[in-house]
Amino acid sequence: RPDQPIVGGDMGVKLRRPALSSYDTEAYLQDLKSIVFCIMIEKSIAVDHLDAILARARDRGVDMTQWGPADFSFSRAEPSLQHSEAIKPFEALVIQKSLEYGIQPRIELGSVEQAKRYIDLGVRHFCIGWDRFILRQQLMLLGSGMRKLTDLL
């Protein structure tokens, strides 16, 4: 957030990438105001103290929460939890509480088909895949298709 009395942020004018072509401080201020302020809920201790964290986040102007099932599972010394049905109550709690505090939750998906459950829980913001995984998946499909064709030669 911008370092201004009304906003309460701590980001001042700095020589960063936006300054490469020009240095319009008004445009830079607008860029800072447009940034989504997101916190991650990814540790067991964070879920244990979720109300306090979300109350403070709301007071600080946090826009979004990001649920982290992998790190949550690791922090409970249960790495396989992230792939089990037992993760769902924790995930639902984070989503429900985020919405109660007026903070939009964001969920990472591997496919569009996974979105329905989250939409039903009130989620409206998604990250679908990651570039390297999407590329790998498509390249594997292309490669296996070409292998089938060329194996017949």
Language-model-derived ranges and their functions:
Residues 1, 131-153:
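C-terminal helical cap(s) of enzyme catalytic domains, especially alpha/beta-barrels
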Residues 47, 84-92, 112, 136:
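Non-membrane alpha-helical structural segments and their capping/turn regions in soluble enzymes
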Residues 1-3, 28-34, 83-106, 148-153:
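Alpha-helix-loop-beta-strand connector modules within alpha/beta enzyme cores
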Residues 52-55, 89-96, 113, 117, ...:
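Alpha-helical scaffolding segments of alpha/beta enzyme cores, especially the outer helices
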Residues 1-60, 69-72:
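Conserved anion-binding
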